[in-house]
Amino acid sequence: MSFLTVPYKLPVSLSVGSCVIIKGTLIDSSINEPQLQVDFYTEMNEDSEIAFHLRVHLGRRVVMNSREFGIWMLEENLHYVPFEDGKPFDLRIYVCHNEYEVKVNGEYIYAFVHRIPPSYVKMIQVWRDVSLDSVLVNNGRR
């Protein structure tokens, strides 16, 4: 099986009913704790606003946020981390009317209320300590 190059960038068009599906494995990092980061950018560059930011700190927490006008907004933390080092994961981010619904391996973990409309998202980037099998956008709900 071939893996995707990390960081992985994907041009997208999101709307209510879209689902971002990310499959991969967190890989051990001897420098620090393994991490996974997913960013939904409003332009095709990393300096743009971030409508949704998800960062997994393995064994500690999951952080969700947005970046508006170059400033990080109020961080939302989840102290339940449903990812395991070296084990495959299936991360799904559903675009709902009012929020992004986040599921890991079929388990609902969080709803992040939209701060920037999902229709503004132009690019998704997935990176950090991860081996990626696939990243795709499904425009049907499930």
Curated annotation (Swiss-Prot):
Domain annotation Galectin: ranges: 6-138
Tissue: Predominantly and highly expressed in the placenta where it is localized mainly in the syncytiotrophoblast and in the endothelia of fetal vessels. Also detected in the amnion and chorionic trophoblasts in fetal membranes.
InterPro entries: ConA-like_dom_sf, Galectin-like, Galectin_CRD
Superkingdom of origin organism: Eukaryota
Molecular function GO terms recorded: carbohydrate binding; lactose binding
Biological process according to GO: apoptotic process; positive regulation of T cell apoptotic process
CDD domains reported for this sequence: GLECT (cd00070)
The entry's keywords: Apoptosis, Lectin
Function: Binds lactose with high affinity. Strong inducer of T-cell apoptosis.
Name of the protein in question: Galectin-16
